[in-house]
Amino acid sequence: MSTHVVIYTMQSCPHCVDFKKMLQTEGIDFVDRDIEKNEEEYQIFVEVTQNDYVPAVLIIEEGVEKHKSFLYAPDRDYNELTEAVAIIKKHLA
């Protein structure tokens, strides 16, 4: 099974900048989707999350027979960036 981490961010968001630094410090590989730069990506993000809070985390677990996705959003699934990092680490373990 392989696990992929996608984070949804905005360049103007200071929490997003801090979050990316935390993930890099922890050695966590991730794909950064800047929804501020891509209107289509932004619309999909809002539709899926039902809000526009960032940074949000999408975890994709790909297995031989099944594929699972988990979406975590601020103020819904975590309040602190350290909690988001812990959630990601749990999926990567």
List PLM regions with ranges.
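Short, glycine/charged-enriched secondary-structure capping and boundary segments
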Residues: 20-23, 47, 72
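Non-catalytic, surface beta->alpha helical segment in thiol-disulfide oxidoreductase systems
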Residues: 59-93
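Thioredoxin-like thiol-disulfide oxidoreductase module
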Residues: 35-53, 81-92
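Short beta->alpha junction loops/turns
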Residues: 12, 35-38, 74
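Local sequence-structure signature of Cys/Sec-based thiol-disulfide redox active-site neighborhoods
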Residues: 1-28
